[in-house]
């Protein structure tokens, strides 16, 4: 994160204003802003390997490879470091992978607060949008880096029980105020570097929702853009606003439907975008053919990396996912928890990364399926402690 950490001079100020600022919607999220914890005790139900639906050998190998590829990032993680070390030299044959998993990991079914086993499985992707490095008549929508005047408080430095939570705002005199919401930023701009210029405000909105993307330049180059920080306001789905306005039915909400509505109602696009006060700031990503980096800071693997609620599933965990594709065909495979998302909250909840470009976007945009999830957890290691919803 490139947002400035608040200095010691402001520490007492942050303590005084913490409650007020939280009420004023300075969110305390981590990459891709997280909603408040929704977990309750009893999230993890002990199961066994026989309870897991069968997967193909190729999916087993690919899911294991996606998880093991993140192990260098987990060397200092007390939960996963020993298992990662044991996995380093395991052959990737289906039999070797199965034997390793069953010998080292226990199975826990994720359960919602009402003890339901099924939840929502959605999809996301890395979009590619036309743009420019300079402002032009056609490309006039800025992609901002982190603002110079936005300060950030890592709250666990003040309150250990708020580990991973962050407060963002702007200091005016000796007062810490909420940072501008999306509508004010769109109208007035911010004191931030402009990484690129896009041709459509809807492209920018979808780039912010996906959390990363690429800008296609006129000379054929592609500029990779990655999540850097967020303005501290809560994420509110623009599709929900369209439903509330009577413009779309809930069952019809998709990226394609939202885009079609915006194309048909250009005068109302600012109103649509203002319904989501959250605003994402970006940084330049590495020029690589690998997937974009998620919250775990490892390249995502198309079809085998998922975003999760980190209050339920710690990043780096291996999951067993059973759901369907948008066309209704079965999708069962191990997946790696390597990202988070503002809309990804709850116990039985995952967002499957589909890859880069339009084909991946078509799958992601229509992915709104029921599914069940099992967490594979190292033997002998205590389960994650469900957070107190009061916090």
Model-inferred region functions:
Residues 2-14:
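Bacterial N-terminal signal peptides that target proteins for export
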Residues 14-15, 93:
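Non-membrane alpha-helical secondary structure
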Residues 16-20:
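Sec-dependent N-terminal signal peptides
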Residues 23-25:
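C-terminal motif of bacterial Sec signal peptides marking the signal peptidase cleavage site
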Residues 27-29, 45, 56-63, 73, ...:
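C-terminal soluble interaction/assembly domains
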Residues 29-30, 80:
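Intrinsically disordered low-complexity regions specifically enriched for long asparagine
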Residues 30-40:
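Short, low-complexity, disordered segments immediately C-terminal to signal peptides
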Residues 43-286:
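Secretory/export targeting leaders with adjacent low-complexity proregions
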């Amino acid at each position: 994160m490139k947002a400035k950490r608040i200095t010691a001079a402001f520490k007492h100020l942050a303590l005084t204003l913490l409650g007020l600022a939280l009420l004023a919607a300075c969110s305390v999220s981590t990459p891709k802003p997280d909603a408040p914890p929704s977990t309750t005790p009893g999230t993890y139900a002990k199961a066994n390997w026989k309870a897991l639906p069968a997967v193909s050998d190729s999916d087993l190998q690919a899911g294991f490879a996606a998880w093991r590829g993140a192990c260098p990032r987990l060397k200092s993680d007390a939960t996963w470091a020993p298992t990662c070390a044991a996995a380093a030299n395991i052959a990737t044959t289906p039999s070797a992978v199965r034997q390793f998993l069953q010998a080292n990991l226990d199975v826990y079914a994720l359960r919602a607060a009402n003890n339901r086993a099924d939840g929502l499985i959605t999809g996301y992707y890395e979009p590619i949008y036309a743009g420019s490095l300079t402002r032009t008549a056609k490309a006039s929508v800025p992609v901002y880096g982190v603002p110079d005047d936005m300060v950030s408080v890592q709250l666990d430095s003040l309150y250990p029980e708020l580990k991973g939570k962050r407060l963002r705002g702007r200091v005016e005199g000796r007062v810490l105020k909420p940072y501008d919401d999306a509508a004010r930023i769109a109208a007035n701009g911010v004191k931030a570097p402009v990484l690129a210029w896009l041709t459509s405000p809807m492209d920018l909105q979808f780039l912010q929702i996906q959390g990363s993307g690429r800008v296609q330049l006129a000379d054929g180059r592609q500029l990779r853009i990655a999540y850097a920080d967020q303005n501290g306001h809560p994420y509110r789905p623009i599709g929900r606003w369209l439903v509330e306005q009577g413009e779309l039915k809930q069952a019809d909400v998709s990226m394609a439907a939202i885009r079609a509505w915006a194309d048909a109602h250009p005068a109302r696009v600012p109103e649509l975008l203002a319904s989501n006060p959250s605003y994402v700031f970006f940084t330049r990503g590495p020029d690589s053919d690998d997937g974009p980096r998620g919250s775990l800071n490892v390249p995502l693997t198309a079809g085998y990396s998922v975003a999760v609620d980190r209050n339920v599933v710690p990043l780096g965990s291996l999951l067993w996912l059973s759901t369907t594709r948008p066309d209704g065909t079965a999708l069962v495979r191990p997946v790696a928890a390597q990202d988070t998302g503002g809309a990804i909250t709850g116990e039985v909840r995952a967002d499957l990364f589909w890859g880069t470009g339009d084909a991946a976007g078509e799958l992601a945009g229509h992915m709104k399926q029921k599914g069940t999830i099992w967490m594979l957890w190292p033997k002998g290691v205590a389960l994650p402690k469900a957070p107190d919803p009061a916090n």
